[in-house]
From Swiss-Prot:
Expressed in shoots. Optimum pH is 7.4. Optimum temperature is 45 degrees Celsius. It is found in: Cytoplasm. It comes from the Eukaryota. Residues 1-25 are annotated as: Disordered. The keyword Iron applies. This is 2-oxoglutarate-dependent dioxygenase 19.
């Protein structure tokens, strides 16, 4: 079992919360205009590709605007998710007994069987590609989630092409290496209840990196997502209508560590409950993910050993959440000197 994570000290939590509002987009969280990446003039698009590469290399995190996902669809998926969380326990319990690799799961914390640190979080997880899975109730969820999965998968695949180009590769190189035509996709709804003592903070979800390639996230207007940048925890405040994009472990592996999967966490505090909704894509489940030869040609050698994505995901999801412990297991340890 992975070693338990440490609950941040009160001082760390207070600093990270950025209650004075200093952790705003103006502090430097990169912003990527998808419209420019798809339809921009050649010189404008080249600049946007370079900026995207810097965002992946320096942050592993950015916001995307002009993404084409209707606001009405975002509101609909959030409302359907709220409705699911309000269902009687009897109508959800078959999914509450699910194991980490089951296609539909409803639960609390990260994986309550092994959680080392209590996390104030309710979640719905449903695999949506290559096969779509959805709870029967609420009845409207299936149609909404199907459309949402399709829209956000297309968005993430467009970003993947641009990220491939930012590495100096052909736009389809990452897709080819990771078999993204059969990519894995999961939708996740998160509910973080308000604290009983609004003056205190608690962990909604401890520090971790995501197991996949790219994660797309939006929230209900209540802040709480924090990212680690240059050793500091920053409160991520979104631009109106934007998505957060989070680089995951598979991007770090396939780029041989050039692009980093960012550490992030959810902090709960205040009188309002927080909700977020996530769409994550990863390689085809049976693909062995390893550094691209082009990324290991700089003399550094391989930073990671190859691992089948299904095995990596199961390892990360079945153990206590603890920063980058799963990634460290596949990291190659080089001899000094």
């Amino acid at each position: 079992m992975v070693a338990p994570s440490r609950l941040p000290s009160h001082e760390e939590q207070s600093a990270a919360a950025a209650a004075d509002g200093s952790a705003t987009p103006s502090q430097g969280i990169p912003v990527v205009d998808l419209g420019v990446l798809i339809n921009g003039a050649a010189d404008e698009r080249s600049r946007a590709i370079r900026d995207l590469g810097r965002a992946c290399e320096d942050w592993g995190f950015f916001m995307v605007t002009n993404h084409g996902v209707p606001e009405a669809l975002r509101e609909a998926i959030m409302d359907a998710c709220k409705e699911l969380f309000r269902l009687p326990l009897e109508e959800k319990k078959e999914y509450m007994r699910a194991k980490p690799m089951d296609p539909i799961r409803i639960g609390t914390g990260f994986y309550s069987v092994v959680d080392a640190v209590p996390c104030r979080r309710d979640y719905l997880k449903m695999f949506s590609h290559p096969e779509f899975h959805c709870p029967e109730k609420p009845a409207k969820l299936r149609e909404i989630a199907t459309e949402y999965a399709t829209c956000t998968r297309a968005l993430l695949l467009e970003l993947t092409k641009a990220i491939s180009e930012s590495l100096g590769l052909a736009g389809g190189r990452l897709s080819e290496a990771l078999n993204l035509e059969s990519c894995f996709q999961i939708l996740v709804g998160n509910h973080y209840p308000a604290c009983s003592r609004p003056d205190e903070q608690a962990m909604g979800l401890s520090a971790h990196s995501d197991h996949g390639l790219l994660t797309l996230l939006f929230q209900n207007g209540v802040d709480g997502l924090q990212v680690k940048h240059d050793g500091e925890w920053l409160l991520a405040k979104p631009l109106p209508g934007s998505f957060f994009v989070i680089a995951g472990d598979q991007l770090e592996i396939v780029t041989n560590g050039r692009y980093k999967g960012v550490l992030h966490r959810a902090v709960v505090g205040g009188e309002q409950s927080r909700m977020s909704f996530v769409s994550l894509i990863g390689p085809c489940m049976d693909t062995v993910v390893e550094p691209l030869p082009e990324m290991a040609a700089d003399g550094r050698g391989l930073e990671f050993r190859g691992i089948r994505y299904r095995d990596y995901m199961e390892m990360q999801q079945s153990n206590s959440i603890n920063e980058k412990t799963a990634l460290d297991i596949v990291r190659v340890m080089h001899q000094a000197g």
